[in-house]
């Protein structure tokens, strides 16, 4: 995808360009991947600047850190001054974005998973489960290192949602509704990504979740 983007920049020679990616791109392959990307665009006649922005400080009810890269054509570098937007002085929380959300379908939990998630309080995760249930639910992950706070995670109303993925109920990145024992609905997913309720998604339920999870949050964009 990067190579195709670079090809387009080479052919079009825009005054400026922007691309977005996960923050892990900076450290991928010990930084060599991002270095290659930087050198490629520099060889095309662009000066790059980059910054990590967290969506929850830009009106999005979600902790979603993204790498935002700006390229400015060298012949315009003294004529164009780009400043990243200033963050809000507070995080946007789930309660702020899910008021009066329209009803819509969701992918229900299995009965086994539902019984496990019913034991988790808002803001909690697998750590709040009885030890025997946590071991049975997590399997080998129970004995692995790291916090694994995404497993059996129920979001609190008073915090931003964790980063949405392309599926609402993956075991390693659970995002359970604060009050109801279920994943977020399609419209809740969209609200958390700051899409307006008028925005329509098409395809199967799983395809709609994927479209929303892959998107750049509207308010951040």
Located regions from the model:
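Conserved Class I SAM-dependent methyltransferase catalytic core
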Residues: 1-64, 68-72
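S-adenosyl-L-methionine-dependent DNA methyltransferase catalytic core
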Residues: 40, 66-220
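Buried hydrophobic packing segments
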Residues: 5, 220-221
């Amino acid at each position: 995808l990067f190579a195709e983007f670079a090809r387009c920049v080479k052919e079009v020679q825009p005054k400026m360009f922007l691309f977005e990616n996960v923050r892990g791109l900076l450290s991928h392959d010990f930084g060599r991947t991002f270095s290659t990307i930087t050198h490629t665009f520099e060889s095309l006649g662009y000066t790059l600047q980059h910054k990590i922005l967290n969506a929850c400080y830009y009106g999005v009810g979600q902790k979603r850190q993204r790498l935002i890269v700006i390229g400015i054509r060298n012949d315009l570098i003294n004529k164009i001054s780009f400043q990243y937007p200033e963050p809000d002085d507070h995080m946007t929380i789930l309660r702020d974005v899910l008021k009066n959300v329209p009803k819509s379908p969701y992918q229900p939990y299995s009965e086994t998973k539902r019984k496990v998630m019913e034991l988790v309080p808002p803001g909690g995760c697998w750590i709040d489960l009885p030890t025997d249930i946590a071991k049975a639910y997590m399997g080998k992950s129970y004995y692995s290192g790291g916090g694994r706070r995404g497993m059996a995670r129920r979001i609190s109303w008073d915090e931003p949602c964790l980063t949405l993925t392309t599926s609402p109920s993956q075991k390693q990145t659970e995002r359970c509704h604060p009050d109801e024992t279920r994943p977020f609905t399609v419209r809740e997913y969209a609200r958390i990504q700051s899409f307006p309720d008028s925005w329509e998604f098409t395809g199967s339920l799983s395809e709609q979740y994927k479209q929303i999870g892959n998107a750049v949050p509207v308010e951040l964009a």
